[in-house]
Amino acid sequence: LKKIDSVQVDARTVNDVKVSKDGKICVISREGASSRKNGIILIDVTNPKEVKIISEYTKNLTGGVHNVFIDKNHIYALSNAERYYVINIDDPKNPKEVGMFELDKEGQSIHDVWIENGIAYSSNWSDGVYLVDVGNGVAGGSPSNPVSFGNYSYASGAHHATFPYKSKSTGKFYTVLGDEIFPNGVNPKGTNETAGFLHFVDFSDVNNPIEVARYELPGHGSHNYWIEDDILYVAMYTGGLRIVDLSGDLLGDLYKQGREIGYLLTGT
């Protein structure tokens, strides 16, 4: 691997980076900007060797943006962990807010949003995952009029990320929900104990979603993950990177079934 270019922005933390499917536009999140405006930055990555900042967008995002998602001509940006705004980028030099989604309840919080086939999967901690129509048509929603139509939550209240996944081997569709738990709190100067696992949920009946399987690595909690060609790649904090075979029907405890096919302990 070799670095071929870079950009420098005013931020204490860039927590998320997403690139459009056509590979032309990158959006990054900002927290802790000295200007206190935070927001997002759009970058032209058409030529990865000569990347250029196109614009920044800060309206309603000054509290900090932890996660973003880019889908076609819209960006979905979390605002201060309370809601997400939908921003049109038909003209990336002049982004425009067109919509917003939040739960209509006191104390709600959001950690992540992922869009697939016109559905936004909103990860809302103790409130679980919300399925929101932002253009699919299943509930009459659009980017400018997000409409919630499904929800699943569970006892730990630690839902922080969602990955919609269709099995190549069976054609079945799963909504994979990840926990993020620190049983003894967070020590920024040391190694932390983590817990939690991945929940595989069948939303075939949106009014009665069913959790059918899990991947739980004893002694370690989950964080980010990716699924490709029925292979799960999941970061498990001190448990390193775990690689899991998801082919065939998914039922029960996938770890105990011996589906793990590889791992990399990145901290050693």
What is each PLM-predicted segment?
Residues 1-268:
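Feature marking well-ordered beta-strand scaffolds used for ligand recognition
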